[in-house]
Amino acid sequence: MSDEASATTSYEKFLTPEEPFPFLGAPRGVGTCPSEEPGCLDISDFGCQLSSCHRTDPLHRFHTNRWNLTSCGTSVASSECSEELFSSVSVGDQDDCYSLLDDQDFTSFDLFPEGSVCSDVSSSISTYWDWSDSEFEWQLPGSDIASGSDVLSDVIPSIPSSPCLVSKKKNKHRNLDELAWSAMTNDEQVEYIEYLSRKVSTEMGLREQLDIIKIIDPSAQISPTDSEFIIELNCLTDEKLKQVRNYIKEHSLRQRPTREAWKRSNFSCASTSGVSGASASASSSSASMVSSASSSGSSVGNSASNSSANMSRAHSDSNLSASAAERIRDSKKRSKQRKLQQKAFRKRQLKEQRQARKERLSGLFLNEEVLSLKVTEEDHEADVDVLM
């Protein structure tokens, strides 16, 4: 009993560099069978062993060191495996290591009982590290991932196996016409606003655009000189977006029969013109020489009358245009003369004001007196003979 107690206490001490890989059971002699001793654990059943683990902050160890996983699989016999049999999860150096066997019962086969170092480390790793959002690349030298053996799940069950091997799927482009405004992201809202702006400006008239602006922002002030309207993202809500979509749908339904009628009218005009041309050519080919001559004569007469009518109309149009041009020239001439008269009057008025200002400032005409003289000419009754 004393030997077993001393062996137990010796394995509960701190790890030393000379003993980097302690076994989980009591010391055995060479050649002893593991199943013969009670309370011993056969390591070949698992093919892995946690060599050392720090009690320091795992997140700090993640950033300062790289995790290395090595494995040789669980199918290798215990006699063929050497030191490569054991999977090691090394977190930095071997300094300041604590024994994995603290508070561990040797009669239990639970690798990581509650409260042990390994359970603390595994829970700390799963707490400090978010595997779903990490860009951490797992390096597994010597392990066959395709064979189905998951060393990581054997060592620490709380960590998901190979989290970064499954590639993240990109989000598919959603149909924005079926989404509510609150269900869209900021980028989707901007994209949908640009789509609505292009659709409304290209397919609708000015009245419809004003109606949509009033739906989006009832208090918007639009002047006749505005050429664009900026839509703020915070002005739109789910209800307003629903009203805009319904308005656009109703407008497209109203415009559809008009477009179809216009297309049908164009097609019917083209078809009737083609039929009339074909019938005219057929009748002209089956007509006799006399009828063709008479038709040609009548066509010549009609063309002559049409040309004379066109000439008279052109002459009357030219007369009208000449009289209109003459009236325009007269009005321009009168307006020019009026402007010249106004300019001369303004110039004379400014000159008189300037002269009066100069006289007042000089003081030379303060005692000025204006005298009015009237000269009367006497009529000479007698004629003067200039020859004398």
UniProtKB/Swiss-Prot annotation:
It comes from the Eukaryota. The keyword Phosphoprotein applies. Keywords: Phosphoprotein. The modification Phosphoserine is found at residues 316, 321. Residues 288-312 have a biased composition (Low complexity). Residues 330-349 have a biased composition (Basic residues). The keyword Cell membrane does not apply. Residues 288-358 are annotated as: Disordered. Belongs to the FAM199 family. This is Protein FAM199X. It comes from Mus musculus (Mouse).
